[in-house]
Structure formats: structure tokens, C-alpha cells
Amino acid sequence: MIALSPRPTKCNWGTVSFASTLYLGPILDLLIAKVPPDWQAEVRLGLQEALVNAAKHGNQLDPRKTVIVQYAVMANYCTWLITDKGAGFVPQYCCQNDDPNSLLPDEHSENGRGMCILHQIFDQVDWNEEGTQLRLTKNR
């Protein structure tokens, strides 16, 4: 099966790929360089969470495996496609609920908080069918 990720046309996409690492400062700087200044801090936090998950959980911090980020900053939105070489991910929490008590996973859970952070920062948070590519979009 071939999984296609539809991308907007007439869009200038940038791409960065890097070996699995948790040293993300320069990569994050590049990815937020053209993001509106009032968004930069929260977008940086969200992208850091997503990139750490891709490198650590997806690629198991294997330096032979890369994380690929395609990104575009458009007039009315910014979007990032983050792809890892892992076995895939199935989201277990849906943090899109308006009930504040349901936004976070159980206090004893070791996973799920990052997902909630992503849903708070970005307007669209979607995985491809294989669970190896995450699309994050923030609308202006």
C-alpha cells in the first residue's frame, strides 16, 4: 500500500532531515525562523515535543535512522510534516475535548501528555495511516 500525504499546491516547501538525536536547538531555530514572532515560543515547544517523540520513540534514538521534516509557512497557515523510520504510532488519547478534566491522560500514565501539548498548540494534529508521519498545522 502506498500512503500519500496531500500537500497544498503553490506552496514553497522546505525540507530538513537529521539523524536521530535529542540535540534539536539548531533544527528548531530553522523550523521557526519564518513563523510569526508571537507564535515562536509555543510552536517551538510543540515542534520540540514532536521531534523528540520521532527521534526517541519512533527511531529509538538510532543515529542510522533519520527524521525528515517538511515545512511551509503560508499567508494563512504554517504546517510541518514530521516523518520517522519507526514501526508506527497509534494515538491513544484524543485531547480535543473542551472538558478540562479530560485533556490530560490519567495522572499515573507515563504517556499522552505530549499529545495534549500538540493539540493545545496546533489547530490540526494528524498521523498518517502507518503512524510514521505527523502533520501539524497552525492557522493564522
Please provide the spans of the model-predicted regions.
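Conserved ATP-binding N-box helix of the HATPase_c
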Residues: 38-63
